[in-house]
A protein has these predicted regions:
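N-terminal helix-turn-helix DNA-binding core of bacterial DNA-binding proteins
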Residues: 2, 10-52, 66-67, 74-92
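Short, hydrophobic-biased segments on the C-terminal half of alpha helices
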Residues: 60-61
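C-terminal structural segments of small proteins and small subunits
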Residues: 83, 87-111
Length: 114
């Protein structure tokens, strides 16, 4: 395997857990809330949520396992915060795939217009 393909393969392997974690609507909503509201306690994250506090805790743990979020103690509360590095890696992966598709579509257009 060429070094370029090997690097691409490593990037995909690293981002699969991120995309899997973001593939759930509840977790995606939690990411949006944390990205717009900053660090939040579980109590605050469950306000106006259609799921229980226990469910939110489980979803946050999935995000943490994927490297997307982490918690810290603030007194008696756990405060959750996003880790933007993994989101950036996922975005770069999508940008790379988009560039590949743009290139393929450009080549197809040239071929068809001959």
């Amino acid at each position: 395997m060429s070094p370029k393909l090997l690097n691409r393969s490593r990037i995909l392997e690293q981002t699969v857990p991120v995309f899997a974690a973001l593939g759930d609507e509840t977790r995606l909503r939690l990411v949006v809330r944390l990205s717009t509201g900053g660090p939040m306690s579980i109590a605050r994250l469950t306000q106006d949520a259609s799921v229980t506090r226990q469910a939110v805790t489980k979803h946050l743990q999935v995000l943490a396992d994927a490297g997307l979020a982490h918690s810290s103690r603030l007194g008696r509360e756990s405060v959750w915060e996003l880790d933007l590095e993994k989101l950036g890696a996922a975005r770069r992966c999508i940008d790379g795939l988009s560039a590949q598709w743009d290139g393929a579509l450009g080549r197809l257009k040239k071929f068809v217009e001959r």
